[in-house]
Each structure stands twice: as C-alpha cells, then as structure tokens.
Design a protein with these regions (language model features):
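Active-site signature of alpha/beta-hydrolase-fold catalytic machinery across serine-
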Residues: 118-122
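Gly/Ala-rich beta-loop-alpha elbow adjacent to hydrolase catalytic centers
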Residues: 108-116
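Glycine-rich "HGGG/HGxG" loop immediately N-terminal to the catalytic nucleophile
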Residues: 69-80
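Short, surface-exposed "cap/lid" segments of acyl-processing enzymes
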Residues: 14-16, 24-65
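A conserved short beta-strand
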Residues: 125-131
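Residue in the alpha/beta-hydrolase core beta-strand immediately N-terminal to the catalytic nucleophile
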Residues: 103-105, 131
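N-terminal cap/lid segment of alpha/beta-hydrolase-fold proteins
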Residues: 1-26
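Alpha/beta-hydrolase active-site loop
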Residues: 78-98
C-alpha cells in the first residue's frame, strides 16, 4: 500500500488551493483535514495535522489536507470570516467526485476545528452526511 501523498492544486473560490491527497485502495472513508490559524503560522504541514493524517491513513481512510486561501501556494487572502469554510467546501466537492461512495469525515485542529465544525454544519444543512 502506498502511503505517499500527492501534491495537488485544486479549484477554490479564490483560485487554486494547495493540497496533499492520499488515495488508499479499498479505503473505508474520506478524511478532510483542516489546519490551525494561518495568522499564527498554521499550515497543512502543522505537526498535529500531520499526526491526524497518519492516524486517519492507518485507520484506512483516504486523506486530503489543504492550505486555506492565502497560505502556501493557495491563492487569495486569509479572512477568518467564512472564506476558509468556503475553501473547505470546494475541497469536499472535489473529494466526493473522486470517491462518491465513501463516507466523509472532517477533522481539524484549533482554528481548523472551527472550520471543520462549520463545514459539517453547512453540509448537513444541505442534506449531506458527515461522520
């Protein structure tokens, strides 16, 4: 089993979003990982987010972590006003297109926990199931 993440630039509301994707064969689900506040140095490479990624991978989940707008190679400017939730929703659209049959889990650390919870609420309001 390959455990190497593939670097991607995915379409986001403000332009490309930098991401790392691991597509496991026979995955039991999809895990979207959201990072801490960029103002305080948070990126998708944060050590807690990296640990979440490995834990989800080891549990059999395909994983995707990404940088919000204005972080790393992602276009736009960080706004802490909902734009990061819009970014995460765009990533979910891409993830679901890859493996629509798999359940989705959304995880985050610190500010990423806020983004994950807000995203889960938004998706559930649209009738989507989030684990």
């Amino acid at each position: 089993m390959s455990t190497r993440e593939i670097p991607l630039l995915l379409d986001g509301p403000c332009g490309p979003l930098e991401a790392l994707y691991l597509d496991l064969p026979d995955a039991r689900g999809l895990a979207l990982l959201c990072h801490p506040n960029p103002v305080q140095g948070g990126t998708m490479l944060n050590k807690v987010v990296s640990t979440l990624q490995r834990t989800a991978r080891d549990a059999g989940y395909s994983t995707l972590r990404f940088n919000y707008r204005g972080v790393g190679q992602s276009a736009g400017s960080h706004d802490m006003a909902g734009g990061e939730v819009d970014d995460a929703e765009a990533i979910v659209l891409w993830l679901r297109a890859q493996q629509p049959q798999l359940p989705l889990s959304v995880l985050g650390f610190s500010y990423g926990g806020f983004v994950a919870a807000a995203l889960a609420g938004r998706l559930e309001a649209q009738g989507q199931v989030v684990e």
